[in-house]
Amino acid sequence: MKGAQYLAGLLLLLFVQNSICVPLQDYHTSTETVEGLLARGQGFTTAKRHSEGTFSNDYSKYLETRRAQDFVEWLMNSKSNGGSAKRHAEGTYTSDISSFLRDQAAQNFVAWLKSGQPKQE
């Protein structure tokens, strides 16, 4: 226990001796100017603003990519669920076939009238 006390006393003595050897800087003898301090401080704010801008830019890119992915998923889901485009195409095809069959029936009827054959029952 006494050895630990001697060691603590020795460390305290070394600390005090080093403190006395280093002279304190006087306010008037300081070589650093106010302008130098301000210039050094601006570097920190620039770095902070740069990091905030970088984060904002990266986050905006992420959100834009996410919106694009959501839009593509929405398009794929609407196409696979039979969206309005598919029904429109089917309706157009059915309408075209119906008009073709009506035209052909009318042509057959006119041809039958021209032939003058009696009605078959």
Curated annotation (Swiss-Prot):
Residues 80-85 form a propeptide. GO terms for cellular component: extracellular region. PANTHER family: GLUCAGON (PTHR11418), PRO-GLUCAGON (PTHR11418:SF0). The gene is gcg. One of its GO terms (molecular function) is glucagon receptor binding. Keywords: Cleavage on pair of basic residues, Hormone, Secreted, Signal. The keyword Isomerase does not apply. The keyword Cytoplasm does not apply. It comes from Carassius auratus. Pfam families: Hormone_2 (PF00123). Its main location: secreted. GO terms for biological process: response to starvation. Residues 1-21 form the signal peptide. Belongs to the glucagon family. This is Pro-glucagon. The record marks R49, H50, R87, H88 as: Cleavage. It is found in: Secreted.
